[in-house]
Amino acid sequence: DNHILYARLMGYTNEQLYNLSQKIINSEKKARSTNCFFGEAYNVSYTDVYDFCSVKQSLKKWEIELGLHHQELGLPWDQPVPEEMWQKVAEYCDNDVIATEAVFNARKADFVAREILADVAGMTVNDTTNSLTTRIIFGGNKRPQDQFNYRNMGDTTQIYDPNRDLPFTMGEPEFDEFTAFDKKGRPIFPGYKFEGGKSLYRGEEVGEGGYVYAEPGMYGDIALLDIASMHPSSIIAEELFGPEYTKRFQEIKDARVEIKHKNFEKARKMLNGALAKYLTDEGSADALAQALKIAINSVYGLTSANFENPFRDNRNKDNIVAKRGALFMVNLKHEVQKRGFTVAHIKTDSIKIPDAT
């Protein structure tokens, strides 16, 4: 919309605007091209409702969810509209505007979160969540990857055993061969391989996102256990962005935890005091917690994105953040089963155990 509006300001005719619209649509479907975008147009808008919403869905779906009127135009886009139909086109456009305003009102909390992120980052509410989060963590460094850490989690040569060189044994091993760590205390997963775009571990294909497992049946008295902040914790434990930038990310995560626990005084001192002005009352604190949650979720998505961005490490072919959690859940499943329990279901960071004691 920004580019169409900017082109109209430059004097494009309706036909030229249509052709520009088609170029933009086709460039999105294929490789993104710059010959149909105007550099000055991006800041024509005040903000992007779709981008700041924490729930990503089409305007039509929002209309259904919010009980709003949805209007179809029913006219071919590639043909001129007769003058007697112009009113119908105007009503169609009106409906989109009214619906967008309703979505804005329904997602006001998301917009307040966007305002907070923009303020902390020193940018505008028209900047994307990804851009704001990038600035908060990396500052002005556009190529921070030279500080990033990445490793092969199946490399058994990195296993550290403090008792390995002792001239005697320490009795029966406390853990099985799949419970191993390197010198930094990071888990090693013996036998894990990533080949041909597939991850294999302990005789099964793990998948490239969160681990999913199920044993169909009817169960009762089920314990549902969650791993708190699995992906953010993996980023921190792996020191994925290097010492300096991982510390900033950890401060965002820790600040959100402190806010949720009402420890406002401690949270005020984090991120060089940038959060202090939003911790004056519980209402503002809730908005800040939501803003930090959006930023945290944005980071994981960018580490696994297939497009270039400052969080992307070209060595990270197997999505190490999600994979570390997935491999842990595989080990957890085997341990629970070894103790005589049924694992009814695993989904990313949660496990369901019937008749748990």
Where are each of the predicted segments found?
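Generic hydrophobic, helix-prone segments enriched in Leu/Val/Ile
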Residues: 17-35, 111-120, 158, 163-164, ...
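Conserved "right-hand" nucleotidyltransferase catalytic core of DNA-directed polymerases
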Residues: 57-58, 62-233, 315, 331, ...
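A generic structural-conservation signal
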Residues: 16-18, 72, 244, 345
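Helical catalytic core of nucleic-acid polymerases
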Residues: 55-56, 76-81, 198-331, 337-339, ...
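Conserved DEDDh/DEDDy metal-dependent 3′-5′ exonuclease domain
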Residues: 1-61, 92
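A short acidic (Asp/Glu
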Residues: 2-9, 234-236, 354-357
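Short secondary-structure boundary/capping segments
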Residues: 7-14, 117-118, 237-242
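Alpha-helix boundary/capping residues
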Residues: 12, 24, 66, 107, ...
